[in-house]
UniProtKB/Swiss-Prot annotation:
It holds the Pfam family ANP. It comes from Mus musculus (Mouse). GO terms for molecular function: hormone activity. SMART domains: NAT_PEP. InterPro entries: Natr_peptide (IPR000663), Natr_peptide_CS (IPR030480), Natriuretic_peptide (IPR050787), Natriuretic_peptide_brain (IPR002408). The record marks R76, S77, S91, K92 as: Cleavage. Residues 1-26 form the signal peptide. This is Natriuretic peptides B. Transmembrane segments: none annotated.
């Protein structure tokens, strides 16, 4: 073979190896070591877990501090939410106007669509 031809083929082969994406970044399957991307993801997951635990502890301390400082305020707010939850059950529903027949008005009152308006007393 011609020396010039062999030299040009070797240069092309080395250039191909240099530019190939599998150059030095290949990781065998099932290797005990982690890839850099997996390592970064593990670090991020650990950081997120730590932050969420810190936030949960802060919220718990805040809630405990709130109940120690203002127990009456908390009880009032709980009582008002109870009243709000009980109101629709105890109130009477009356029809203000009727645009369509009785069956359509009943469907409109359930879906709250149409011209049938409900008034809570």
């Amino acid at each position: 073979m011609d020396l010039l031809k062999v030299l040009s083929q070797m240069i092309l082969f080395l250039l191909f190896l240099y530019l190939s994406p599998l150059g030095g970044h290949s990781y065998p399957l099932g290797s005990p070591s982690q890839s850099p991307e997996q390592f970064k993801m593990q670090k991020l997951l650990e950081l997120i877990r730590e932050k969420s635990e810190e936030m949960a502890q802060r919220q718990l301390l805040k809630d405990q501090g709130l109940t120690k400082e203002h127990p009456k305020r908390v009880l009032r707010s709980q009582g008002s939410t109870l009243r709000v939850q009980q109101r629709p059950q105890n109130s009477k529903v009356t029809h203000i106007s009727s645009c369509f027949g009785h069956k359509i008005d009943r469907i409109g009152s359930v879906s709250r669509l149409g011209c049938n308006a409900l008034k809570l007393l």
